[in-house]
Every structure is written in structure tokens, then in C-alpha cells.
Amino acid sequence: MELETIGFNVNFAPVLDIGIPYGRSYGHDAAFVSKFTEAACRGYDQAGIIYSLKHFPGMGKSEVDPHTEQYRITASKEILLQEDTIPFKNIIQNFDNQDFMVMVGHLIYTGLDTLPASVSPQVINNFLRNELGFQGIVITDDMEMGALTSMYGFREMGVAAVQAGVDVLLVCHNYEHQQQVYQGVLEAVKTNKLTTAAIDAAAVRIVENKMIKLLD
């Protein structure tokens, strides 16, 4: 409610990761984390705040800080379903309107794909959208993080993310990096590497989300 009072309508929270080592998690148990994140999400809904479930499909098993380096989480898909993705699945399947975002992290989940999650069609389109049923806005974590920049240039990472099913590309700090990501996507559309239909679908999801919040 305080965020709404001072004029904010978006918050990149809550953190749904289970037991991440640097203190941003609600806890080390999926049910416990689910309970607290559901309460947080209902509070954001009541205040009309657009929020973001992060960092899909869960970073609790990571042993590094993705701001600085890449890491491969080797848990199987079955383990991810039984543990890390439970809080995400709880919100996605139990909230009537999917008028929130899911933020996808940059780590690699070998049980799902060999690519970082934020540029993986397997993680985003197949797992998050088709299997878990999320049809709302997908946003990347900050694309300037070392986990992604260690593998991709800025002009190519945005294109790869949109191809994977991302709607919003988050580049937080450097204007030159923002321009490189933008120009990469623009050039990809001009050369038909990306379709205008994909861009239009993302725009529709974003506008629909805003309208739902305005009407709540």
C-alpha cells in the first residue's frame, strides 16, 4: 500500500527462490515460501501494484551470485517440479487473473536445457507457458548480469530472449547497453529473424496487464 501511495505501480518482487544463500528468500521449505509469497501477492493485488515472481525456475540451488558469473543447476526436471517451482506454480494456477509478471533468471538448468533460462524456449515457452500455464508477461532479470554477459553480447541476447518467448527485456544500468539490446531487436525484426507477430503479442500482453490493473 505504501508503494502505491508514493506513486509506484510496479515492484520487482516477491522472491520465490527457496533458500537462496544470500538472504533474499522467505525460507528453505517450498510450502513455507509459497505461504508468504501468496500473502505478498494478494497485498500487491489489493494495492493495484504489478508485481514480478522471481527468479524462475528458482535459484535456490545456485552456489554463486548470478550478478557476477554463470552457474549450472543440475537438478532434474522432476526435482525442480517437486521443489523449486512449487511457489511459482501455486501463484500461476491459483490466482484468477494472471495480471503479474514472471521474471526469468539467467542460470542454466541442465534438466531443462543447455541455454540460460532467460534465452531458452524450452524453459519459457515449453515449461513456463505450456506446462505450468502462465500466459502473462515474462520479463528477464537484468541482462547486464555476469551470468548472461559471459555468454552473449548485448545485440544478440535481446534477440535470443524474444525468440525464447520473453515480453520485456530488462537492462538496468548502462544506456549504451540498452541501445545495443534495442538495436539488436530492431535489426532482427527488419531482417525477419524476429517476427512482428512476436513483438505484437508481447505488446498485447503488456497493455492487457496495465488495463486489468487500472480496472481493478
Regions found by a protein language model. Give the residues of each.
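Short, conserved phosphate-binding/catalytic loop or strand-edge motifs used
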Residues: A13-P21
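Second-shell residues forming the walls of enzyme active-site clefts
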Residues: H28, F32-A198, E208
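Short glycine-centered helix-capping/turn motifs at secondary-structure transition points
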Residues: N192, K213-L214
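Core structural elements
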Residues: R205-K213
